[in-house]
């Protein structure tokens, strides 16, 4: 069912408490990547334009219920002020007199950022008392934090028990694209999965085996599948306790008529380092002991490009190799270029959060795909077909009866 968004309700001159995801990386108190702040701007600006008083809530890192200065949102308020071109009032508290005064003194269109929600241990416990304190500050709750949608916390879920909760624009976009990719994908539907472990992607594989036409596997997880097929993978990373599961997945794919594509060669080295000697081995010939696969090889890239070509829906989650090191980035880069090319031909392309999002950004292709998810764990659970608590708590559009 479709969710209500900030667009569907009247927020003019109202007090709006908005859960955003400002969980940005910091180094020596400076923000090293402000992407998450930038992603939240459209919803914040919309509320400002509608003369709402905007009260922002976010977590940052894992302070575990303690006030730790290195996890303060103060640097975020400074960056947000620059991006909005207006002063954001930072209140180093979560509730109480100082917060109430800031809100009482606010004029329509003002923005207030409260301190890190996880400075109170009630946040991660979804404590109803804490949720009520926040709900009492405002008329409406806007949830724009997809990155925490897989968590039931006080600031995104608990608060919806007391005041109406609607989706912000970023949340709306995430739901739209991830739903399109999981519920009603246009065919041919190609899923590309990478990363280190099969165990991280089991849920996604089993859910998407019912929907995908092709599943392409890269990254270190490919070696668990290849070893399950009896191939020699040398010293590559293998989850020994998942070999039977890998066999079962391969059998299930066969039964369901899903084309399950594994790499045919790998770029290998003896150490995961830059500038080391690399060799490409064909999988059928085997990888010698002491060598480990760190990227898909040139033949695999060619094969993957053929399989991606002509797709109408593509979901990509997890890199093809150790793309952070230039010697092992080619597979990930070429797959990303392929996905961008299909997007240009009209395909819907969704990139899961985390490492794939980092890869797409590294190769400057972020604007060449349909959607890059802002949530790593959240997008993974969505692709697994799970209902996320942070989405379930948003009010649904009522079906209008004739």
From Swiss-Prot:
Cellular component terms per the entry's GO annotation: cytosol
Pathway entry: Carbohydrate degradation; glycolysis; pyruvate from D-glyceraldehyde 3-phosphate: step 2/5
GO molecular function, one term: phosphoglycerate kinase activity
UniProt-listed Enzyme Commission number(s): 2.7.2.3
Keywords (A to Z) from UniProt: ATP-binding, Cytoplasm, Glycolysis, Kinase, Nucleotide-binding, Transferase
BP GO annotations: gluconeogenesis; glycolytic process
Pfam families on file: PGK
Major site of localization recorded for this protein: cytoplasm
Location in or out of the cell: Cytoplasm
Binding site for ATP: 201, 293, 324, 353-356
Disulfide bonds: none
Keyword set includes Phosphoprotein: no
Residues the entry annotates as binding substrate: 21-23, 36, 59-62, 118, 151
Catalysed conversion reaction: (2R)-3-phosphoglycerate + ATP = (2R)-3-phospho-glyceroyl phosphate + ADP
Record InterPro entries: Phosphoglycerate_kinase (IPR001576), Phosphoglycerate_kinase_CS (IPR015911), Phosphoglycerate_kinase_N (IPR015824), Phosphoglycerate_kinase_sf (IPR036043)
UniProt xrefs under HAMAP family: Phosphoglyc_kinase
Family: Belongs to the phosphoglycerate kinase family.
Assembly with partners or alone: Monomer.
Name listed for the protein in its UniProt record: Phosphoglycerate kinase
Provenance organism: Thermosipho melanesiensis (strain DSM 12029 / CIP 104789 / BI429)
Origin organism lineage: Bacteria, Thermotogati, Thermotogota, Thermotogae, Thermotogales
